[in-house]
Amino acid sequence: MSTKRELVLKAFRGEAVDRVPVGFWHHFTREDEWLKGFSNPEIIEKNLNGHKNFLHKVKPDFVKLMSDGYFAYPNPSIHKGLENISDLAGIEPLGADHPWITEQVELVKKIRAGFEEDIVAIYNIFAPVTYFKWLVGEVSGGDDLIANFFDQDAATLKKVLDTIGQDIASLSQRIIKEAGADGIYLSVQSIQDARVSQEVYKQVIAPSELHVLETAKEAGGVNILHICGYEGARNDIHLFTDYPAPVINWAVGPEGISLAEGREIFGGRTVLGGFENGKKGLLYTGDKAAIQAETKRIIAETGTTGLVIGADCTIPSDIDEERIEWVREAAAE
């Protein structure tokens, strides 16, 4: 019988496994705290304690370490209300030793120090364009601003994203090499504005995302690509087929693409997901029999290799965590 670490890494590589591993996660802080943790010990302590309690109660097969509190990338050149991308023509990276990066390295070290067993730990990272959207807009939104900036000056927008990407790559590298994370969970999302075509995305936005993933890979990371459908965002998952990550996760229902279909689109790579993540989904509302039946249906449809059972995205923080164990029980049968 494989250890949890062996089991998960085999699944990530698409090898035969003793049972299909399971991975679910949720936030440990409120949404209004996600952007406010930098140099705010109370929020970071809340996140730390949340991880400790979750790991003790759930004993997961592997864990996504949540970056709650560090959603705001603190580059002094960028501010809310920015109207002209040309104002950022002189933007510089924070640098690999900036406290925003170092604090996250320390966070991962502290979480891992409290592990009760040796499991794979993947750290949550957002795409450079997402950090940028949140600084000039809101946690959910800002896509129209990105499209505006593209219309104004695509070259400067690309420079801004590449600069942010340098820092996110440095963060990823240090998280893996210094803090001992096994890789990153990179959250990407199509821009929710028709002005940003697939071609524009690949030319202006994708290079910064690819740099982050490639840096994490070179640092030894085993990485997950999360194509995020938060609050109803829709994605063209074909945009991301050349992204170097061995495990792919997307919103199966909203995108209308099953795990089996997605695996083909991504050339046979391991797929993660299957369950809707929200409060209207089966995982949150269903009884044990229904949840276990759905688990078995997902496995029957997708196969036992190259599969990790999970959700479209982060599950509700108030979920009865026994439900995760129901999935794991069914996946082991």
Protein language model annotation of sequence segments:
Residues 25-32, 52, 61-95, 99:
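Alpha/beta catalytic barrel-like cores
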